[in-house]
């Protein structure tokens, strides 16, 4: 058994200081039945806990660290910027540089506004959609998580799903009444909702790949159908690419699937490990945002030079060749996990989109949240604990996906497959 004495002690202390001992619920490791690991250091594809244990990391800070930990170019640039000042409350040139990169690479974005988190991005995009259309209702998908804004904490995924919560107390009934929810990948339900409420639906918000119920890609025609129905009814289509943005492809999920939304929300990768979000889209829509237009949004630290620098240095290193390597490595890991499960007769279904991978312990084809919930959660928890013993750090939730980075080597992937083989052999025995 791995020695985790220091992590156990740190968590005991933390529970007296913070709700549940953490600053984001999934970090408490509740659903996998073990004490959370307290991390001390990361380098490349590895992380090290405060007890000195080394792990191959597939959490990558929940996706942002697409070049792995302590990327030299990012770190050196941050040092240089920090010496000049961390924030000014005034524009800086690095904001222009990052905005230009985003606009060049994201098909839907003509103008972009930087914010501080993915939640800020989605909340701001919803306000913009409502203000632009003059409508009140939004349509989202069951099990899709778009941050913790009130309108979006209705049948959400991610940490909400991990804790088994359908919704969150504290969301006013009046707010919830303006959120329509339907099953992901169910285009007929979307069409029915528009037939009933189409004149008052401001937008449809969707993850191009549902990354917060595990990893659930869109079925053929689903995203295209959303584009068609929103255009038919004059509603906006918002892609929440906080997770998929620059993760699944060079041009994000919209480039990967060839569907262009009206607005796009970004986060994670564009911050390079620092707190960043963004939303952008067609110029005629984005010009409605203050100070160009009447729809208000602001932020004290929005566009701060540290975050902009980390984002710029992260994106500038991402080339089309990087994504070819992601595909090769992710396919290698996917096939290895599948073969290990098949060898031991373990029910499983594996989904992948680019460098995002989700393994479900079920025989069902996982195309929506109901199917994701058929996964054997007890088996997942046991599998998770065994993988920790083997030195592999996975997201501590069935409803989160694995992420690869440019720092992961073939040897890392081979070691991970070998660890899964050992874990599954033990659990099947």
UniProtKB/Swiss-Prot annotation:
Q: Which cellular compartments is it found in?
A: Cytoplasm
Which residues are recorded with the post-translational modification N6-(pyridoxal phosphate)lysine? 268
Quote the Gene3D superfamilies the UniProt record gives.
Aspartate Aminotransferase, domain 1, Type I PLP-dependent aspartate aminotransferase-like (Major domain)
Q: What is its EC number?
A: 5.4.3.8
Biochemical pathway: Porphyrin-containing compound metabolism; protoporphyrin-IX biosynthesis; 5-aminolevulinate from L-glutamyl-tRNA(Glu): step 2/2
The disulfide bonds in this chain are none
Q: Name one GO biological process term.
A: protoporphyrinogen IX biosynthetic process
GO cellular component labels = cytoplasm
Cofactor(s) recorded in Swiss-Prot or TrEMBL: pyridoxal 5'-phosphate
**Main subcellular localization, coarse class?**
cytoplasm
The record's family statement is: Belongs to the class-III pyridoxal-phosphate-dependent aminotransferase family. HemL subfamily.
Which PANTHER family would you find in this protein's record? GLUTAMATE-1-SEMIALDEHYDE 2,1-AMINOMUTASE, GLUTAMATE-1-SEMIALDEHYDE 2,1-AMINOMUTASE 1, CHLOROPLASTIC-RELATED
Q: Which NCBIfam families match?
A: hemL, PRK00062.1
Quote the protein name from its UniProt record: Glutamate-1-semialdehyde 2,1-aminomutase 2
Which organism is this entry from?
Answer: Bacillus cytotoxicus (strain DSM 22905 / CIP 110041 / 391-98 / NVH 391-98)
In the UniProt record, the gene name given for this protein reads hemL2
């Amino acid at each position: 058994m791995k020695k985790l004495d220091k992590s156990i002690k740190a968590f005991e202390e933390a529970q007296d200081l913070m709700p549940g001992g953490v600053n984001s619920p999934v970090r408490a490791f509740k659903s996998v039945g073990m004490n959370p690991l307290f991390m001390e250091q990361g380098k490349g594809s590895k992380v090290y806990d405060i007890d000195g244990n080394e792990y191959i990391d597939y959490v990558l800070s929940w996706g942002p660290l697409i070049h792995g930990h302590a990327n030299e170019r990012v770190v050196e640039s941050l040092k240089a910027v920090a010496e000049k000042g961390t924030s000014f409350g005034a524009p800086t040139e690095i904001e222009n540089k990052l905005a230009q990169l985003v606009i060049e690479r994201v098909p839907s974005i003509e103008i972009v506004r930087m914010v501080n988190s993915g939640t800020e991005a989605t909340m701001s995009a919803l306000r913009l959609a409502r203000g632009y259309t003059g409508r009140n209702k939004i349509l989202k998908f069951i099990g899709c998580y778009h941050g913790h804004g009130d309108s979006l904490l209705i049948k959400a995924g991610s940490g909400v799903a991990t804790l088994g919560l359908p919704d969150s107390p504290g969301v006013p009934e009046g707010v919830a009444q303006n959120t329509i929810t339907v099953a992901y990948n169910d285009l007929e339900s979307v069409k029915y909702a528009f037939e009933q409420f189409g004149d008052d639906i401001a937008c449809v918000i969707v993850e191009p790949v549902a990354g917060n119920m595990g990893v659930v890609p869109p079925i053929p025609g689903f995203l295209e159908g959303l584009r068609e129905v929103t255009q038919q009814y004059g509603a906006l289509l918002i892609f929440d690419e906080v997770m998929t943005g620059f993760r699944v492809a060079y041009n994000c999920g919209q480039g990967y699937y060839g569907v262009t939304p009206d607005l796009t929300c970004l986060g994670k990768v564009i911050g390079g490990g620092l707190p960043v979000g963004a939303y952008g889209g067609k110029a005629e829509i984005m010009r409605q945002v203050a100070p160009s237009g009447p729809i208000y949004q602001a932020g004290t630290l929005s566009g701060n030079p540290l975050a902009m620098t980390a984002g710029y240095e992260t994106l500038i290193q991402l080339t089309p060749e990087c994504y070819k390597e992601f595909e090769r490595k992710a396919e290698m890991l996917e096939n290895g996990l599948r073969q290990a499960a098949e060898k031991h007769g373990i029910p499983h279904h594996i989904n992948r989109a680019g460098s995002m991978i989700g393994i479900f312990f079920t025989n069902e084809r996982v195309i929506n949240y109901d199917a994701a919930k058929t996964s054997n959660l007890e088996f997942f928890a046991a599998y998770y604990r065994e993988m920790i013993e083997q030195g592999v750090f996975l997201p501590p939730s069935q409803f989160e996906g694995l992420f690869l980075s440019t720092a992961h080597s073939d040897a890392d992937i081979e070691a991970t497959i070998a660890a899964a083989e050992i874990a599954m052999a033990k659990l099947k025995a």
